[in-house]
Swiss-Prot record:
It comes from Mus musculus. Residues 399-413 have a biased composition (Acidic residues). The gene is Chfr. Interacts with HDAC1 and HDAC2. Interacts with PML (with sumoylated form of PML). The lineage of its organism: Eukaryota, Metazoa, Chordata, Craniata, Vertebrata. This is E3 ubiquitin-protein ligase CHFR. It catalyses: S-ubiquitinyl-[E2 ubiquitin-conjugating enzyme]-L-cysteine + [acceptor protein]-L-lysine = [E2 ubiquitin-conjugating enzyme]-L-cysteine + N(6)-ubiquitinyl-[acceptor protein]-L-lysine. The PBZ-type zinc finger (also named CYR) mediates non-covalent poly(ADP-ribose)-binding. Poly(ADP-ribose)-binding is dependent on the presence of zinc and is required for its function in antephase checkpoint. The FHA domain plays a key role in the anti-proliferative properties of the protein and is involved in initiating a cell cycle arrest at G2/M. The FHA domain may be required to interact with phosphorylated proteins. PANTHER family: E3 UBIQUITIN-PROTEIN LIGASE CHFR, UBIQUITIN LIGASE PROTEIN CHFR. Poly-ADP-ribosylated. In addition to binding non covalently poly(ADP-ribose) via its PBZ-type zinc finger, the protein is also covalently poly-ADP-ribosylated by PARP1. SUPFAM superfamilies: RING/U-box (SSF57850), SMAD/FHA domain (SSF49879). Belongs to the CHFR family.
Length: 664
């Protein structure tokens, strides 16, 4: 933290306010506000600078005082907003500050150690602060909050009396000024004296251990910048206020104050120690029970941007982090990355499960619901449209690398509407399909050309090397069974059961994954398809099948490609030689059923080709490889190394070997 405003001597006018850092040491100096505008941020030119804290924006906020009325406002200029009293999130807006407000530049509910908070006090009251009252306030703010767990300490806490001026200030409603983050110890207690109009108080003795002035008690001492003289008073009376103990070392929630009809401040709290309630007198509007244990469900359902329960939440893909739709709408205008992990966002989707959980949670905890005004504001700030939630989805034919990975854009909405409009599937060999096609043709054409024309359906011709010229002479029965090609998503007659009886029927599925493909039946028409189904020995894997072919190790794969290029060999040569070695029993595949004649799809064929290529590279004599390749030591983890995808590690060690360390 740097104070650039103090580098120059301040003007002769009196300071109009000051900032006290929460959790500060006793001797840490206060920050006096004497300029009309006081800027706070990470930028070094700010009056209060945090150059090393990346959670603070460059220009986070600024405090401005009206010289005529004395009103102080906070204007937020940050990215994530400024939190006031843990209740009000100010984002790109101005907020009227009152004495006793706590300004959170960084507020992490689940990581309080990262919080950066300051207590604002006004010094523009009728009576200025004396040095004695200042020291007394610092004593209350910092000293008594420390853990007094030593024996004999804290038996008789000193509770200060308030002057009539300070009590008059307390009669006006003030924002919550909880400073529970000031309690650094694992076991603390929060106490609050009950004040009367005559300035009377009750003291408490919590035994030899934890004693501290309550957060609200401390904030009341600095309301409107006026402090009363402190006088220690000891009483033998039993405690009339409660202690809040937390075994989980979680943050304590401040108890709510209520005003009586005659102006007295009713701060009756309920005793929660050992399940007993205090004997304090309560009115008809009793304060609700404070939770002893933290609500894990609430923490799970909290948006990290607004630090409140999720509202109309959306999830980002692929990272699946969830935020309020309104909160993320403001974020996505500035960045296309996830606010949590900075992963590029590919898609936005509604998270119906979390929305239902939030709704069920609010039924059990209606007090934690957002206000109607807040809900209307969030709905108005929601810029996520239905088009963003249902974009064109890029569906890939395979998860493997290769030239057949050209993508096809399909819409979820289109597929749903087509299912509704068609009572059953009609393929090119259905009688209904042929009848419609003949009616749409201007002149008769041969049936073979008709089948080829309709097969294209307006798409570019298939790049398959073995595209059948005509569909088999077959007609589907009425409402017959159909299979959808995994490559082109077009229907075809499901004749797989018939093939078991008649081998002349063309194969329609992969022998390994059992997924249906139409290439061998009548030729796949998808653009870029090199033959999605074929016998292993005839499978067209494409020229890019050698990229990362050796366990995604690009360095080892480049060594193999250079070896083949110098000898005029291609991937087809590798496949042919490997299948011969497989037939002789020299090479092995993890799936023993696969031979050169096994009908495979592109994915399964590429996977088996990679297994054979590794064994092909393993059997290359060292004398035929460069010295820079053979001189590398073997990696301990061999072919199973997970770091071999990194270029530096792959160049340094040989990974065409078996694992020798930590092998079970």
């Amino acid at each position: 933290m740097e104070l650039h405003g103090e580098e120059q001597p301040p003007p002769p006018q009196e300071p109009w306010g000051r900032l006290l850092r929460l959790g500060a040491e006793e001797d840490e100096p206060q920050i006096l506000l004497w300029k009309r505008e006081w800027t706070i941020g990470r930028r070094r030119g700010c009056d209060l600078s945090f150059p090393s804290n990346k959670l603070v924006s460059g220009d986070h906020c600024k405090l401005t005082v009206d010289e005529i009325s004395g009103e102080v406002t906070l204007e937020d200029t940050s990215t994530n907003g400024t939190v006031i009293n843990k209740l009000q999130v100010v984002k790109k807006q101005t907020y009227p500050l009152q004495s006793g407000d706590i300004i959170y530049l960084v507020y992490r509910k689940n990581e309080p150690e990262h919080n950066v908070a300051y207590l604002y006090e006004s010094l523009s009251g009728k009576q200025s602060l004396t040095q004695d009252s200042l020291e007394a306030n610092k004593e209350n703010m910092f000293h008594v909050t420390k853990d007094c767990s030593g024996p004999g300490q804290g038996d008789d806490p000193q509770v200060p009396l308030l002057s009539p001026m300070a009590q008059t200030c307390l009669e006006e409603p003030q924002p919550s000024t909880s400073t529970s983050d000031l309690l650094p110890t694992a076991s603390t207690s929060s106490t609050e004296p009950e004040l009367t109009s005559a300035g009377q108080k009750h003291s408490s003795s919590s035994g030899p251990g934890n004693t501290s002035i309550s957060p609200k008690g401390r904030s009341s001492l600095v309301a409107n910048g006026e402090l009363s003289s402190l006088s220690p008073v000891f009483q033998d009376k039993e405690a009339s206020f409660s202690l809040l103990e937390s075994k989980d070392h979680e943050e304590l929630e401040p108890a709510k104050k209520k005003m009586k009809g005659d102006g007295e401040l009713d701060t009756n709290l309920q005793l929660l120690v050992s399940g007993q309630r205090g004997n304090a007198q309560t009115s008809s509007e009793d304060v609700k029970d404070a939770s002893v244990k933290p609500d894990k469900m609430e923490e799970t359902l909290t948006c990290i941007i607004c630090q409140d329960l999720l509202h109309d939440c959306v999830s980002l893909q692929p990272c699946m982090h969830t935020f309020c739709a309104a909160c993320y709408s403001g974020w996505m205008e500035r960045s296309s990355l996830c606010p949590t992990c900075r992963c590029p966002v590919e898609r936005i989707c509604k998270n119906h499960i979390l929305n239902n959980l939030v709704e069920a949670y609010l039924i059990q905890h209606p007090d934690k619901s957002r206000s109607e005004e807040d809900v209307r504001s969030m709905d108005a700030r929601n810029k996520i449209t239905q088009d963003m939630l249902q974009p064109k989805v890029r569906r890939s034919f395979s998860d493997e690398e290769g030239s057949s990975e050209d993508l096809l854009e399909l819409s979820d909405v289109d597929s749903e509407s087509s299912d509704i409009s068609q009572p059953y599937i009609v393929c090119r060999q259905c009688p209904e399909y042929r009848r419609q096609a003949v009616q749409s043709l201007p002149c008769p054409v041969p049936e073979s050309e008709l089948g080829a024309t309709l097969a294209l359906g307006g798409e570019a011709p298939s790049t398959s090397a073995s595209l059948p010229t005509a569909a088999p002479d077959y007609m589907c029965p009425l409402q017959g069974s159909h299979a959808i090609c995994t490559c082109c998503f077009q229907p075809m007659p499901d004749r797989r059961a018939e093939r078991e009886q008649d081998p002349r029927v063309a194969p329609q599925q992969c022998a390994v994954c059992l997924q249906p493909f139409c290439h061998l039946y009548w030729g796949c028409t998808r653009t870029g398809c090199f033959g999605c189904l074929a016998p292993f020995c005839e499978l067209n894997l494409g020229d890019k099948c050698l990229d990362g072919v050796l366990n995604n190790n690009n360095y080892e794969s480049d060594i193999l490609k250079n070896y083949l290029a110098t000898r005029g060999l291609t991937w087809k040569s590798v496949l042919t030689e490997s299948l011969l070695a497989l037939q002789r029993g020299v090479f092995m595949l993890s799936d023993y059923r696969i031979t050169g004649n096994t009908v495979l799809c592109y994915c399964c064929g590429l996977r088996s080709f990679r297994e054979l290529t590794y064994q092909y590279r393993q059997n290359i004599p060292a004398s035929e490889l460069p010295v820079t390749v053979t001189s590398r030591p073997d990696c301990y983890w061999g072919r199973n190394c997970r770091t071999q995808v990194k270029a530096h590690h792959a160049m340094k060690f040989n990974h065409i070997c078996e694992q020798t360390r930590f092998k079970n």
